[in-house]
Amino acid sequence: MEIQINTLAAETFLALYSSAGWEPPCIGQIETALQNSIAAFTAYDGGRAVGMVRLIGDGGMSFYIKDFAVIPEYRSKGVGTLLLRALEAYIRGRIPADWAVSLELISTIEAVPFYKKTGFEERPCEWDGPGMFKMLRPEGKGENDGIS
């Protein structure tokens, strides 16, 4: 298994994203997201892309895990752990050793045990409230069309 950094093409992203069962955005939106990511990590097995994760954030205090996907036949085989280790090493290699930074994400229900096993805490917890999420959709295309 090989982890590559910043080689993820939009078409590969689309295939991996779709393998997770998520409705994919258009190629233009994917290209913009990849260009504006801090880094993108792709797991390859013999040249075949089998997993990915993007890192976004401010580069100093807060980092966010986005679009973490592993194709179904490679799940529970260590691919996600390898991707996460590469992502964490990347962050640690780019910040001063005495900085504490947050690494955040929104998990699917099914992935909660994986994240807990790798050191993440569910929210709410004793010291923090729940994570929040809001999808901004095109005007007139669904809920949350604006602030009331």
Predicted feature residues:
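A short helix-loop-beta-strand connector motif used in the catalytic cores of GNAT acetyltransferases and
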Residues: 32-42, 99-101
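Short amphipathic alpha-helix that is part of the acyltransferase structural core
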Residues: 1-28, 145-148
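Conserved beta-strand in the GNAT
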Residues: 42, 48-57, 61-64, 69
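Short alpha-helical
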Residues: 8-12, 60, 109-113
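Conserved acetyl-CoA pyrophosphate-binding loop and the N-cap/start of the following alpha-helix
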Residues: 74, 78-86
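Conserved active-site alpha-helix within GNAT-family acetyltransferase domains
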Residues: 93-134
